[in-house]
Curated annotation (Swiss-Prot):
There is a cross-link at residues 213, 216 (Glycyl lysine isopeptide (Lys-Gly) (interchain with G-Cter in ubiquitin)). It holds the Pfam family ATG19. Induction: Translation is induced by nitrogen starvation. Translational repression during nutrient-rich conditions is dependent on a uORF (upstream open reading frame) present in the 5'-UTR of the mRNA; it promotes ribosome dissociation. Translational induction occurs in conditions reducing translation machinery efficiency, leading to ribosomes scanning over the uORF (leaky-scanning), and increased translation of the mRNA. This is Autophagy-related protein 19. The coiled coil domain is required for the interaction with LAP4. The C-terminal WXXL motif is crucial for ATG8-binding and Cvt pathway. The gene is ATG19. Keywords: Autophagy, Coiled coil, Isopeptide bond, Membrane, Phosphoprotein, Protein transport, Transport, Ubl conjugation. It comes from Saccharomyces cerevisiae (strain ATCC 204508 / S288c). Its main location: membrane. Residues 21-28 are annotated as: ATG11-binding. GO terms for biological process: autophagy; ERAD pathway; protein transport; protein-containing complex localization; vesicle organization. Changing residue 412 to A: Impairs vacuolar transport of LAP4. A motif (WXXL) lies at residues 412-415.
Length: 415
């Protein structure tokens, strides 16, 4: 039992754990890399996807939820990969029959995942342990409905659209009825009479009000006065905002260009070098770069890692491994990042701390740094780029379940 837990911890550090369900089985799978084709290949090795009707659909969810999302395109797989990168536990269900067994509903990518109610969570645990069939609809209808049960009701988007259309029609009818009531209940106008004596020396006022012959003309004067007041207030507020903005602009400090750096944390274990890269700069690191590590020995050697075609966004992490490496890490070792044109765009040295800040060399021009920023690489499941042999790190592990003597070795390629 202890050995199985130890193996599980080791496998977790080497990939992304997934719990996979079909109609009869449940097993734990370590996905080595966030690649849709590799994930499908790993599951397909266990002969769980093929049936008499062809390939079954795949669904996924974070653990302990009552609904699932289907995996069809890059957008769907991107959501799953985002959860796995955050070290969250996720489950994959194979086929609609499996969803029926575990009493799960299908939602769109725009809907949120819903938590299981206490009763559903208890039933789910019992079915996982005893592989029992889900509760029949008749038995479920006889249970008492709690007041909070409506909070987890799943409604299709088509049904919601119909609700919205009906609500809009109801709102239009209410507005029309309210307008009709105002017209029918309109009180008769009460004429207000009065006189204002204007001095004869104010000839402008006398001439202005002499031209007012009707109530409509008086209403126009009243409306123009209110428009003038509103525009005056808006101009005053905009003037204040502009003055505040100009004061703030004078206080803005320009960030010095030498503050941009790539942070690399180096570790050595099991005859391997691990480089965890964190993009702490203010720009995206383009793909097709190379990481060069040169030791500080008497006869220095350089190890090169191809960083792959994918770019590294701002505040994003990526980890690389170099195997084998049996030498001891020494202070003064050099780390360089080269772009696809062979130019060194970041440089740093290894010291007493495992964390190294890589900065652009002083000789690097702004044009060279700008040229290294390539457009975002479009990821497609059906058209994956060909991998260079120099950028492949191959490892073999065995996936097996309890009580199975036949182990199957899986080999993956990690960039």
């Amino acid at each position: 039992m202890n050995n199985s837990k130890t193996n599980q911890q080791m496998n977790t550090s080497m990939g992304y754990p997934l719990t996979v369900y079909d109609e009869c089985n449940k097993f734990q799978l370590i996905v080595p890399t966030l690649d849709a084709n590799i994930m499908l290949w790993c599951i397909g090795q266990l002969s769980l996807l093929n049936d008499s009707n062809g390939c079954k659909h795949l669904f996924w969810q974070p653990n302990d939820k009552s609904n699932v999302r289907i995996l069809l395109n890059n957008y769907d797989y991107g959501h799953l990969f985002k959860y796995l990168q955050c070290q969250r536990k996720c489950s994959v269900y194979i086929g609609e029959g499996t969803l029926k067994k575990y009493n799960l509903t299908i939602s769109t990518s725009f809907d949120n995942f819903l938590d299981l109610t206490p009763s559903e969570e208890k039933e789910s645990l019992c079915r996982e342990d005893a592989h029992e069939d889900p509760v029949s609809p008749k038995a479920g209808s006889e249970e008492e409905i709690s007041p909070n049960s409506t909070s987890n009701v799943v409604v299709s988007r088509e049904c919601l659209d119909n609700f919205m259309k009906q609500l809009l029609k109801l709102e239009e009818s209410l507005n029309k009825l309210e307008l009709e009531q105002k017209v029918t209940n309109k009180e008769p106008n009460h004429r207000i009479s009065g006189t204002i004596d204007i001095p004869e020396d104010r000839s402008e006022l006398v001439n202005f009000f002499t031209e007012l012959k009707t109530v409509k003309q008086l209403e126009d004067v009243f409306q123009r006065y209110h428009d003038y007041e509103r525009l005056s207030q808006e101009c005053d507020s905009k003037t204040e905002i502009a003055s505040d903005h100009s004061k703030k602009e004078t206080k803005i400090e320009v960030e010095p260009p030498n503050e941009r750096s790539l942070q690399i944390t180096m570790n050595q274990r099991d005859n391997s070098l691990y480089f965890q890269l964190f993009n702490n700069t203010n720009s995206v690191l383009a793909g097709n770069c190379k990481l060069k590590f040169t030791d500080a020995g008497d006869k220095p050697t350089t190890q090169i890692i191809d960083m792959g075609p994918h770019e590294i966004g701002i505040k994003e992490y990526k980890e690389y491994r170099y195997f084998p490496y049996a030498l001891d890490l020494e202070a003064g070792s050099t780390i360089e990042i080269e772009n696809q044109y062979g130019e060194v765009i970041f440089l740093g040295k290894y010291g007493s701390s495992p964390m190294i800040n890589l900065r652009p060399p002083s000789r690097l021009s702004a044009e060279s740094l700008q040229a290294s920023q390539e457009p975002f690489y479009s990821f497609q499941i059906d058209t994956l780029p060909e991998l260079d042999d120099s950028s492949i790190i191959s490892t073999s592990i065995s996936l097996s379940y309890d009580g199975d003597d036949n182990e199957k070795a899986l080999t993956w390629e990690e960039l």
